[in-house]
């Protein structure tokens, strides 16, 4: 269930213990899922769905923060402002949905020191944990896995995260079970 770095997946083992025959195929995409082309029943998106076949079954605002390893910050110092970050620090980021985070989009566009970008959240997280630079991640990663939330930069970008289902299949029992599991995760406290 790690279909997005914004969604914690701590409860997956209990889900499959209860529903061992349900298979989840995760497809990562920049654009909102095209349910007809991908032949999928539900998906996550940072945009409200368009079209009458899709419905929002859950949504959540996800808060992000600027993060780096303590080792990177010890060696390079913590930026005092967005301008300091842009001018003096290595930036590691994800292209794709980060354009929904306006302050991060501006940093990625203006920084002469973007040293790493990827379409994979997990690659960005791995590079940040290796001391690659400073990035923006959902707050659930703060003080976890070797990353520390920067305290000098006060901006906390936020984006709405939607769980979207196909209107005609959302009430099929095995799909409803997955929807309910994701909804429970989305409504839990994780930022």
Predicted regions located by residue number:
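Central regulatory/effector-binding core of bacterial HTH transcription factors
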Residues: 1-52
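A late-sequence structural motif
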Residues: 153-191
């Amino acid at each position: 269930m790690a279909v997005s770095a914004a969604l914690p997946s701590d409860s997956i083992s209990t889900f499959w213990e209860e529903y061992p025959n349900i298979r989840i195929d995760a497809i990562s995409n920049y654009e909102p899922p095209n349910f007809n082309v991908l032949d999928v029943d539900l998906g996550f998106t940072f945009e409200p769905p368009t079209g009458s076949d899709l419905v929002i079954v859950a949504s959540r605002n996800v808060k992000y923060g600027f993060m780096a390893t303590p080792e990177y910050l010890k060696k390079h110092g913590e930026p005092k402002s967005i301008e300091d970050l842009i001018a003096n620090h290595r930036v590691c980021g994800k292209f794709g949905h980060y354009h929904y985070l306006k302050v991060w989009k501006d940093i990625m566009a203006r920084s002469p020191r973007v040293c790493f970008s990827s379409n994979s959240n997990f690659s960005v997280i791995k590079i940040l944990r290796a001391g690659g630079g400073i990035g923006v991640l959902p707050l659930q990663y703060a003080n976890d896995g070797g990353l520390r939330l920067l305290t000098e930069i006060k901006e906390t970008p936020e984006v709405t995260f939607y769980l979207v289902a196909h209107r005609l299949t959302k009430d099929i029992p095995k799909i409803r079970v997955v929807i309910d599991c994701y909804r429970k995760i989305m409504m839990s406290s994780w930022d």
